Amino acid sequence: MESRKINLMATAIALIVVAMVVAAADDKTKDKEECTEQLVGMATCLPYVQGQAKSPTPDCCSGLKQVLNSNKKCLCVIIQDRNDPDLGLQINVSLALALPSVCHAAADVTKCPALLHLDPNSPDAQVFYQLAKGLNKTGPASAPTGSSPGPISISPTSGSDDGNNSGRTTSVPGRNHAQSFYKQWLGLEVVFHFFVIFYIFILV
């Protein structure tokens, strides 16, 4: 009997862990889908962040400021998933981190862990802190030039990292409500699984 109870509890705990992992993966996917628009809007920044241009163009800086004004999290997503094969990009992280300073746009990558809902002590969060320290030591690069290269075509994949529509991003109220509902649902799911364990422990 005791062995059966232990097995049931282990199964219930495993179900909760799986549910939480799936929920976390869904949250990251939502971040990627939400920021697909911003990646396309910052297409003119690619030559700079890939190390092919000495300075960003005015169009790049304009697109960056629109992103930071509408959703600061998206710059964090780009940096976090810089090595994602779905992006098909080779991004120089140091240049990407220096971009806000070069474009005279306010951005603080040390806030990325909070924006991405990361544990401050997790390896992913520490990456942002270490990158910020390295940026403070090296300093920003040159200011944007007046010349602008031709438009760059990007074909983001579904679930791709950071950006899908036209670069002019706006906050969509319906999306915010959906995210709020999702978080509430996740909380209720955790409570439900807690009571499942409680029931097994007390009544079985």
From Swiss-Prot:
UniProt topology in membrane: Lipid-anchor; GPI-anchor
Domain of life: Eukaryota
Lipidation (GPI-anchor amidated asparagine): 176
InterPro entries per the UniProt record, alphabetical: Bifun_inhib/LTP/seed_sf (IPR036312), Bifunc_inhib/LTP/seed_store (IPR016140), LTSS (IPR043325), Plant_nsLTP (IPR000528)
The UniProt record lists the keyword Disulfide bond: yes
Region (Disordered): 139-173
Stretches of the chain forming a coiled coil according to its record: none
Biological-process GO terms, alphabetical: leaf senescence; lipid transport; response to herbivore; response to insect
Disulfide bonds, paired cysteine numbers: 35-76, 45-60, 61-103, 74-112
Glycan-linked positions: 92, 136, 164
Compositionally biased spans, kind Low complexity: 139-163
Biological role: Probable lipid transfer protein.
Family membership: Belongs to the plant LTP family.
Protein name: Non-specific lipid transfer protein GPI-anchored 14
Native organism: Arabidopsis thaliana (Mouse-ear cress)
Gene name in the database record: LTPG14
